[in-house]
Swiss-Prot record:
GO terms for molecular function: glycine binding; glycine dehydrogenase (decarboxylating) activity; pyridoxal phosphate binding. It comes from Staphylococcus aureus (strain JH9). PANTHER family: GLYCINE DEHYDROGENASE (DECARBOXYLATING), MITOCHONDRIAL, GLYCINE DEHYDROGENASE, DECARBOXYLATING. The modification N6-(pyridoxal phosphate)lysine is found at residue 273. It catalyses: N(6)-[(R)-lipoyl]-L-lysyl-[glycine-cleavage complex H protein] + glycine + H(+) = N(6)-[(R)-S(8)-aminomethyldihydrolipoyl]-L-lysyl-[glycine-cleavage complex H protein] + CO2. This is Probable glycine dehydrogenase (decarboxylating) subunit 2.
Length: 490
């Protein structure tokens, strides 16, 4: 690996340098030893970087210029919905009455904030077809876990605590079985058929008296709509199980079909994906959960309700699984999502899904002559192609993904879902122009040609990035995860 990267902030540190200073205090101070027990006092000086303000600003400005995001390039990361985040969202989120409020203020002082929460709950109920919605969960997987804990409490409360199996398709997001495990369930895999949909015969085989639920994304991770969803619902419900909707792919079906109308009992949404909360940097996210009326009494508390002309917290929820997030979740993301929903309206959200589906099918059609397409039918918002043709020349999907970096394009999701060999999952979203799509398509086609005629160029990529190709074997055996490790290496 060759690095053209900047020094770490710790490497810029020089003893005695500082960014600012405070006047000498005339207040008598006490020693740390007089205030804390020995066990709480550091034995060694903390290694904070010591840098001047200008060095600090330049360091992080330089790093920010090297970041890649939706605002500076195409980001077709499958199943992540890396759409453009309208800047009006940021303007609303920075209104002082919102940005300077505190969750411990009296309800009377934050009526505007509570109204936003309540109104967003109502909008999401309409979009999903659910009867009640909580905004508390902080991310998609958190929403999955919350819904499964609601299912668990529901089954236990109905004398069916033995139901400890959750059915998960082989094309599902990896968070689905992980969330099931965290909620105390065992995952049972159901196979996909030759069309990439849930195999109904295999579903009938795995459903039994211990089935608590099935977790589905529709359209699924292959970008294929589960056309047999009503039959799936009947099979699972007849066995006493519940249906959970993973909202990761809701961007494909807004104002077209609702999870509630498909028979789902609970749904989580990703406000940071479908509803333009900025994401990709590790947070904050938001994963609201909606449920049918039979499960409403199990929702986390508090809920925000409207009482006359006022809004307030409601802690009187009979079977609540309890609080799942301090205060009431990530309020800043609620503001952005609510702004997006209100500015788009129902017609706009419908057009979003139509454009997302059109863009994905356009890319798929143009690439079909150059790559293996395992599932030929029309896709929804995303699709999966395979790099098996290029593998014949010694070039893998990983190599092509790294080569894309040289063209200023973020690679798609690769090797996922697991049931497609050399898979590359592409989700263009609705916000990209035809010119951008054509650039991406032409670039991938040129890389496919390179794989055939000049494979070393692809195998050695990337060539223009700050960090060249990683030595993955050494990185796995000798990871440098903190500054102390780096000092030891040097």
């Amino acid at each position: 690996m060759t690095s053209k990267s900047s020094p770490l902030i710790f490497e810029r540190s020089r003893e005695g340098r500082y960014a600012y200073s405070l006047p000498k205090s005339d207040i008598k101070t006490n020693s740390v030893e007089s205030l804390l027990d020995d066990k709480f006092i550091r034995k060694n000086k903390a290694e904070f970087p010591e840098v001047a303000e200008l060095d600090l600003v330049r360091h992080y400005t330089e790093l920010s210029n090297k970041n890649f995001g939706v605002d500076n390039g195409f980001y077709p990361l499958g199943s992540c919905t890396m759409k453009y985040n309208p800047k009006i969202n940021e303007k609303v989120a920075r209104i002082p009455g919102f940005s300077e409020s505190h969750p411990l203020q009296d309800e009377d002082q934050v009526q505007g904030s509570l109204e936003i929460i309540y109104s967003l709950q109502e909008e999401l109920k309409e979009i999903t077809g659910m009867d009640e919605v909580t905004l508390q969960p902080a991310a998609g997987a958190h929403g999955e876990w919350t819904a499964l804990m609601i299912f668990k409490a529901y089954h236990e409360n109905n004398g069916e605590g033995h139901r400890d199996e959750v059915i998960v398709p082989d094309s599902a997001h990896g968070t689905n079985p992980a969330s099931a495990s965290f909620a105390g369930f065992k995952s049972v895999t159901v196979k996909s058929n030759e069309r990439g949909e849930v195999d109904i015969d295999d579903l009938k085989r795995v459903v039994n008296e211990n089935t608590a639920a099935i977790m589905l994304t529709n359209p699924n991770t292959l970008g294929i709509f589960e056309k047999n969803i009503m039959e799936i619902r009947e099979i699972v419900h007849n066995a006493g199980g519940l249906l959970y909707y993973d909202g990761a792919n809701l961007n494909a079906i807004m104002d077209k079909v609702r999870p509630g109308d498909m028979g789902f009992d609970a749904v989580h949404l990703n406000l940071h994906k479908t509803f333009t909360g900025p994401h990709g940097g590790g947070g904050p996210g938001s994963g609201p959960v909606g449920v049918v009326k039979e499960l409403a009494s199990y929702l986390p508390k508090p809920m925000v309700i409207k009482d006359g002309d006022k809004f307030k917290y409601d802690n009187d929820i009979k079977n609540s699984i309890g609080r799942v997030k301090p205060f009431y979740g990530n309020f800043g993301i609620y503001l952005r999502a609510y702004t997006y929903i209100r500015t788009m309206g129902a017609t706009g959200l419908k057009e979003v899904s139509e454009a997302a589906v059109l863009n994905a099918n356009y890319i798929k059609a143009r690439l079909s002559e150059h790559f293996e397409i395992p599932y030929k039918q029309y896709c929804k918002h995303e699709f999966v192609l395979s790099g098996v043709r290029q593998k014949e020349f010694g070039v893998r999907t990983l190599d092509m993904a790294k080569r894309l970096l040289d063209f200023g394009v973020h690679p798609p999701t690769i090797y996922f879902p697991l049931n497609v060999e050399e898979g590359m999952m592409i989700e263009p979203t609705e916000t990209e122009s035809k010119e951008t799509l054509d650039y991406f398509i032409d670039t991938l086609i040129s890389i496919a040609e390179e794989a055939k005629n000049d494979p070393d160029k692809v195998l050695e990529a990337p060539h223009t990035t700050v960090i060249d190709r990683l030595d993955e074997a050494t990185a796995a055996r000798k990871p440098i995860l903190k500054f102390e490790n780096l000092k030891q290496e040097k």
